Amino acid sequence: MASLAAANAEFCFNLFREMDDNQGNGNVFFSSLSLFAALALVRLGAQDDSLSQIDKLLHVNTASGYGNSSNSQSGLQSQLKRVFSDINASHKDYDLSIVNGLFAEKVYGFHKDYIECAEKLYDAKVERVDFTNHLEDTRRNINKWVENETHGKIKNVIGEGGISSSAVMVLVNAVYFKGKWQSAFTKSETINCHFKSPKCSGKAVAMMHQERKFNLSVIEDPSMKILELRYNGGINMYVLLPENDLSEIENKLTFQNLMEWTNPRRMTSKYVEVFFPQFKIEKNYEMKQYLRALGLKDIFDESKADLSGIASGGRLYISRMMHKSYIEVTEEGTEATAATGSNIVEKQLPQSTLFRADHPFLFVIRKDDIILFSGKVSCP
């Protein structure tokens, strides 16, 4: 699975830098894996330059290990299917919903084999709709479907005015995550602290506290500490906390560097006193501008798109690509009482390393080596 892990990570970090540059130092949160799967869904029916641009953006030859199109297609599909099967197998340990839907104006007829592949491989919804005559009903129906699929967690993925009656095809991608820590933070130890950020001027944030053994690495270049916070279900959050400027870390984010920084040989199990903010980030992105900037242009251009493998009825292109993501980080774990008892014992031990996340930081959430989410907290 290393090849998909590498391709997804490079896609993730390239996209992160592009999105961060356009956020004005605000919070960033998205799921590279769900976007990777959404674009792989489009790739199933893409041809010529549309296909090659997707392949380049997703590093498909890296993901598949093969150079030609048919082998890379099957290699990519099989690896993604295994990843999602693995994620869903541990679903009882966390709340994770990933939703992909492709909605095209009714004059286009989806190819039967495309619908079957989309549903089988990516559990995606593929549907003909009436943007032209029933725009508001269509918008509400899409929103209701996403809300149902995410158990009410993600609502109004397409806001009023979010699509027009001239829309041809809309790609909707939504993801919700809430995990439970292996070792919960104790609510009584959460305190209000100042978060040192221009975006948080004068704002007090709820800072969780815990002192016990964590995996921690100290990196000299760029200067930072990386803390591993474990969720149930084999999912880990890695918090990249800079000593100085966060941009020094952002500029060096690559799959190879992240693997080196978080290598078990490098991360030492030690007593750490952790101060970590509660935060909730909900983002609704129109992805076209970011993906165009990274070279994926043709699928959004009526005169250039070749998505003839998806449907018949004329030149098909993507009018809108929506990505809505939601994460909530609280004290919650499997057994708060067990964590409390552990805290009492470990606080008697001296020489803890301090990890105080009271200024902007990056985080990556992984299952094994596959990045599920990445984000930046400028103000909790």
Curated annotation (Swiss-Prot):
Compartmental location: Cytoplasm
Tissues with expression: Predominantly expressed in mesangial cells. Expressed in the epidermis of the whole body.
Source organism, top-level taxon: Eukaryota
GO-annotated molecular function: serine-type endopeptidase inhibitor activity
This protein's UniProt keywords: Cytoplasm, Palmoplantar keratoderma, Phosphoprotein, Protease inhibitor, Serine protease inhibitor
InterPro entries tied to this protein: Serpin_CS, Serpin_dom, Serpin_fam, Serpin_sf, Serpin_sf_1, Serpin_sf_2
SUPFAM superfamilies according to UniProt: Serpins
Family of the protein in this entry: Belongs to the serpin family. Ov-serpin subfamily.
Protein name, as recorded: Serpin B7
Organism: Homo sapiens (Human)
Gene: SERPINB7
